[in-house]
Amino acid sequence: MAKYNFDEVIDRHGTDCLKYDFGMKRKGRDDLLPLWVADMDFRLPDEILDEFHKRIDHGIFGYTDPLDEYFAAMNHWFSTRYGYTIEPDWVTLGAGIVYALGTSVRAFTEEGDAMMVMQPVYYPFSEVIKNDGRRLVNCQLRYENNHYSIDFEKMERMILEEGVKALIFCNPHNPVG
């Protein structure tokens, strides 16, 4: 892969970019500095763009199935880090984390059920719970000595007191590690 220029500044204003073009619409201000996690401001490497162009030049955009290489890459990642492998039939692909989370919330809980998150956490987790008619229970992460951790005694107490039916556990925890 070629050397990548991380110093290149790309102005994304005027490209229908949620991160930059919708601050006024969503927050009523256009002077905010968006510090997003999953929306990078780096240009894709040419090697990746070339593969996109091959697919585009084919001209057909029907339904696809994940390639064997997808599962091989996933298993390499899991085996390298955790020493185990994933069977392809264990995996259900989704259109994104928020959509997949909403589908899971509706599949495994009922309206009115209590669901727990540990804030600070990726804000759509709480929105999905509330928007799907579930009751949000926040077990605030403990912050001590510049480090976040779970207070397991508090968490257990809240689960029992609030009748929590499901916990959304973000690992690694976004945004605090």
Predicted region positions:
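Conserved core of the PLP fold type I
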Residues: 61-177
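N-terminal small-domain helix-loop-helix segment of the aminotransferase-like
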Residues: 2-96, 103
